[in-house]
Amino acid sequence: SITGKEVVLGGSSKLLAKSDRSGGKILVGGDWQGKEGTRQAVFTTVEKGALVDASADKVGDGGTVVVWSDIKNPKSKTIAQGKFLAKGGSTRGDGGKIETSGYYLLTHGIKTSVKSMNGKSGEWLLDPYNITIGSSASGTAFNDNDPGNDTYTSSATSEVLASDISSALENGHVTIQTGGSAGDGNGDGDIIVSASISKSGGGDKTLTLKAHNDVTINSSISSSSSDLDLVLWSDSDANGSGGVNLNSNLSTNGGNVWLGGGSGSASWQSLTVGNGNS
């Protein structure tokens, strides 16, 4: 693991935790969901061109990659713009898991793969405070200066490109979740889709949007290649204030669609969904 208050991996950096039989575990700025007692960074940056790879080469499951900063600290940020891999073995083995999380999160141009050639796909998890899935960078959350010199806008919303989500869905499942119980209270834990997400390759995949408050779909979500299961999960604290606002088309190419809420989880059509009203 690599951690500290400020962690920066430059564009020529390579972190590898690979073997013929399994992928390893690479932690940058913290552990999965901030657990296991690993120190949590405040500023974590993985620049474009950097490679973080915890794949299995031949047999076995892909490993774990985490790029993290403290999601409970309103001044924390994660910039993840490199290439992140946790693929299953080429002969057999399931895909691994990748997490990129921070109170503010910027992932423009990120490349991820948790695919498996002969097993189950893995998952890419994004866990910021508020997030907009858009078509371009607005720069509202933070600038790209060195970590110690950045300026912050406490009410800013994290950003991920719809094109990056579209590409990632060809190589694994994607989960975006938000939390509104921590931080400075200037965000509600919303997820807003403001640019179209279109899966055009790969096998059956799942896109889960799980918001502490609202999930708002203002642009289409579609698949033209295999099934795309959609889980649109609002009000994950079950306080009754969140909902799913569907203002555009969903086209799943035969996949399932679940809309609802709940603070706990349930199983429906082999998907993990909320245990509230749906």
Where are these regions (language model features)?
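Extracellular and secretory-pathway beta-repeat/beta-biased strand scaffolds
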Residues: 1-278
